[in-house]
Amino acid sequence: MQLTGAEIICECLLEQGVDTVFGYPGGAALNTYDALYKYSDKIRHILTAHEQGASHAADGYARATGKTGVVMTTSGPGATNIVTGLATANIDSIPLVAITGNVTTDQLGRDSFQEVDIVDIVKPVTKASFLVEKVEDLADTIRKAFALAQHGRKGPVLVDVPKDVTANKTEFVQTIPEKPRTFEIRNPEKVRVVQEMIKNAKRPMIYAGGGIISANASEEFKAFAELIDAPVCCSLMGLGCIPADHPLCVGNIGMHGGYETGMATAECDLMIACGARFSDRVAGDRERFGEQAKIVQLDIDEKEINKNVKVDEYILGDIKEILIALTIGLDRQNHPDWLAKIEEWKHHFDDKKLPECDLPLPQQVLDTINEIKCPSDIIATDVGQHQMWVAQFSKIMESRTLLTSGGMGTMGYGMGAAIGAQCARPNDRVCLITGDGSFHMNLNELVTLKSYELPVVVVVMNNTVLGMVRQWQKLFYGSRFSQTDPHRATDFVKLANAFGVDGLRITKPEEIKPILTKAFEMNKPVVVDCHISPDANVLPMIPPGKTINEIITEM
């Protein structure tokens, strides 16, 4: 059948099982948006306040479901506004497809109105980017984009479509999309080698990363951890790959991880990294990271092997397939003394009492949210101290229930991510935990929450400062608080009301439970302005480039 390019875009989205897209219209995308109007009974479009919000929403949708998120924009600033969102998705291996409009093909390269070479701009922060100059190539390019986004190490792909390509017609033939190919183990001979290392280990430890969740391998991972009886230390992206209350779950690893995860890293004799990339926020001093251990890396991406930390053995392939292969023929291991030692480390700071404070403490707020929420409810975060408090204190019980910007550390990510997650999973509650600094970045997306009546609970940890940078200034820059005490006087309750959203405020510890309970029960968008002390810090902390021996526990 003969269809316009714009109609082909919509048909290809339907082929791929897309039911929701996030975006913002504009001149170069008018034909596509006109087609979306015709397809509105099949494809829901969520209009955000800003294209960056749309890109983060597509990201949140993808993280919450495992499906490919879709963002659509016009040319020029519409396209450049999603670069941060693509970079955020790229470093965290999140599958997105961005479809941008552009000027007509005869106007390309002429500095036309709202023309920008978005294809070259995003090359460093995408798996691939394509300019479609003929309508005949459009369908196959979009299909290729979706296949690339989900194949191997997942990530974002951009398709740039000039306006005349969306207007021109060509023959369109529907196809059934290929299922993502299984990424087979490339060096299967190493499976037996790693099994022998597991059998010989006395103090094994698993360093679990986001690759487990990306591969939908949480069940296989839990079975593997139980089989080898190894404690699990999770990166920020790996939280949720094993329930937080599982006996083998030790907690978050790295700069702001617990004492117990740092000691497990230092004292283990075998470290198995599953879908984790040894980032600087985890490894610290790379030369001394896991220095007593043989290190095994299980990963889908060959570029990650030995990139940050030198490993003794590695297996390349899909994490799910690797974990299944490692369990075959391997007897159950037992390490009671090692696990008892880790349990002892967990209680290393038990004698330290919570500081007395007239304002709510972050731990009190997060402990209360743990009590209120269900295991399948979703926590989204922005970036800053509140993000690290979530990693330390929130009980993440299932995969795909913690949405956070890991590698890029994108302030302003959380609002869009929460929107995308709530659209993707309307039957689960979504709570955004943010800070006043991050919230100021993309608070315009409150209009999106209200427009679609998305029942997201926004909890603002309001300390009136840029807390994480301020903490570093206190520790490493002689308490010279340069531009981190902004003296803003934003009334977040009134702000929420201005958008038509309910606002609540917490200023005392005894108000935490009743107000948060009320917020979660309202079943509509609500902002909770939770005042905390500007002197509340994220501890313990291992300074950058250091080891557990240099841990900071007090400030």
Q: At which residue positions do the language-model features occur?
A:
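Active-site diphosphate/adenylate-binding microenvironment
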Residues: 6-9, 14-19, 27, 32-37, ...
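Phosphate/pyrophosphate-binding active-site segments
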Residues: 136, 174, 192, 196, ...
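Glycine- and charged-residue-rich phosphate/anionic-cofactor binding loop of Rossmann-like
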Residues: 130-133, 356, 504
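Thiamine diphosphate
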Residues: 99, 108-114, 255, 306-308, ...
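N-terminal alpha/beta PP-like core and its mobile active-site loop of ThDP/TPP-dependent enzymes
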Residues: 1-330, 368, 372-375, 455-458, ...
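An acidic- and aromatic-residue-enriched active-site/binding cleft used to recognize and process polar
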Residues: 101-102, 301, 384, 435-437
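Conserved structured core elements
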Residues: 215, 262, 317-320, 359, ...
